[in-house]
Structure formats: structure tokens, C-alpha cells
Amino acid sequence: MAQNIGLNVQPPKQECKDVNCPFHGTLPVRGQVITGKVVSDKMMGTVVVARDYLHYVRKYNRYEKRISKLHAHNPPCIQAKVGDLVKIAECRPLSKSTTYVVVEVQQP
């Protein structure tokens, strides 16, 4: 049975025994909720999520497109793949570079 994590997301249908799962483990989520695209899933239990944003260049009075890459824990009950549009939520640091967890794979 998936527990309520305090966000407006659908809980996963599968169950897992991951301690760092916000639905079936003890990992609390708080802070930012970001939507992005999975660009890599080669790490064990972690995905790289890229999000686009605009940066203003004052000299030219224009905006340039930039990409920010974030590492997010991928619980076994969610299993996000490359190309998926995912919603990630901030949590406590799980490793040196992983401070987000995947909470939902959004349907295109």
C-alpha cells in the first residue's frame, strides 16, 4: 500500500522494498518539484533529468536557452526510462550529487 507523500501525484501500481522510495520507504520529500526529461538511466537506481530554461543576456537584450541536469533517485516501483517526462521532488541528500527523487512518470 502506497502512502500519501503530500504531493498531487498518482502513486505507482507496483510495490517495492526500497528504503529510499517516498511511497513505500521512509524518504520524506519537501521543497522544489521540477518537471524534466530523462536523458540517461545508466546509473544503478539513478537517472539524469534535464530541464530547459531561459537566461537573459543583458548586452544583447535577448534570452538564450540553457540546460540544467539534475541527478534523481529512480525507485524500482517507478522505473523511468530515457525519453520519459518525469516529475522529481527535492529530498535529503542521498549521495554527493543526488538530492531529488522521481515521484511520477507523466503521460505524453
Curated annotation (Swiss-Prot):
Keyword Transit peptide: no
One matching Pfam family: Ribosomal_S17
A GO term from the CC aspect: cytosolic small ribosomal subunit
GO biological process terms, semicolon-separated: translation
Superkingdom of source: Archaea
Entry GO MF terms: rRNA binding; structural constituent of ribosome
Keywords from the named record: Ribonucleoprotein, Ribosomal protein, RNA-binding, rRNA-binding
Positions in coiled-coil regions: none
HAMAP family registered for this protein in UniProt: Ribosomal_uS17_A
Subunit structure as annotated in this protein's UniProt entry: Part of the 30S ribosomal subunit.
PANTHER family listed in its UniProt record: 40S RIBOSOMAL PROTEIN S11 FAMILY MEMBER, 40S RIBOSOMAL PROTEIN S11-RELATED
Function: One of the primary rRNA binding proteins, it binds specifically to the 5'-end of 16S ribosomal RNA.
Family listed: Belongs to the universal ribosomal protein uS17 family.
The protein's name: Small ribosomal subunit protein uS17
Name of encoding gene: rps17
